């Protein structure tokens, strides 16, 4: 692992700490390999299903739910006829506390979004407007190159591979970036000397 002075952007925290340092970071960095392999496998398999059978996300969800409900329905019917126990299904209910907590979370984030939109519309923050405009432009550009399903699958694969790859080969990546930056700086200086030969004479 690189020392803190050699890390990209001179950061002091590790990749694991930047990603939150919890279970999500462990999964993204393949420290829980079974979970990571499962996520990547499901992502690739679902993408192949979507592409091979021309499924949409709604078609897949509807088909899975229909199959699941049919199995449970037939199981319950046969259990009542054959005097067998019914399928052990818990009762799914949303408690009042969960609903209240979700509504508070949603209200806070919607209010933040509305406040940001208001500040941009009133031209109060030019930097924020630039960031939002660039982000929306990039999203529009990406959306024109691929559909939503492909974007979701690609995003999951990127999230599951890039951080782990960077953490494992950080020394090589940082060294390559520094090499490219140095070569770019040398090229810039040569072009500057070529464009302004009087600077070379003065030096």
From Swiss-Prot:
InterPro entries: Reticulon (IPR003388), Reticulon-like (IPR045064)
Protein's cellular compartments: Endoplasmic reticulum membrane
TM annotation in the entry: 34-54, 55-75, 132-152
Keyword presence, Protease: no
Gene Ontology biological process: response to bacterium
Topology in the lipid bilayer: Multi-pass membrane protein
An annotated GO cellular component: endoplasmic reticulum membrane
Coiled coil: none
Record keywords, A-Z: Endoplasmic reticulum, Membrane, Transmembrane, Transmembrane helix
Record-annotated Reticulon domain positions: 24-203
Pfam families xref list: Reticulon (PF02453)
Domain of life, source organism: Eukaryota
Keyword Transferase: no
Protein name: Reticulon-like protein B12
Classification of source organism: Eukaryota, Viridiplantae, Streptophyta, Embryophyta, Tracheophyta
């Amino acid at each position: 692992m690189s020392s803190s002075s050699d890390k990209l952007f001179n950061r002091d925290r590790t990749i694991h700490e930047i990603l939150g340092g919890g279970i999500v970071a462990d999964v993204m960095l393949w420290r829980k390999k079974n979970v990571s392999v499962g996520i990547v496998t499901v992502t690739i398999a679902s993408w192949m299903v979507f592409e091979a059978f021309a499924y949409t996300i709604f078609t897949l969800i509807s088909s899975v739910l229909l199959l699941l409900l049919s199995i449970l329905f037939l199981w319950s019917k046969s259990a009542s006829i054959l005097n067998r126990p019914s399928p052990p299904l818990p009762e799914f209910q949303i408690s009042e506390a969960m609903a209240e907590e979700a509504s508070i979370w949603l209200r806070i984030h919607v209010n933040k979004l509305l406040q940001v939109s208001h500040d941009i519309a009133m031209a109060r923050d030019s930097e924020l407007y630039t960031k939002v405009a660039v982000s929306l432009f990039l999203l529009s550009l990406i959306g024109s190159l691929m559909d939503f399903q492909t974007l979701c699958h690609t995003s999951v694969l990127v999230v599951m591979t890039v951080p782990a790859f960077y953490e494992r080969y950080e020394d090589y990546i940082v060294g390559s970036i520094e090499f490219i930056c140095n070569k770019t700086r040398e090229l810039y200086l040569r072009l500057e000397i070529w464009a302004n030969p009087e600077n070379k004479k003065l030096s």
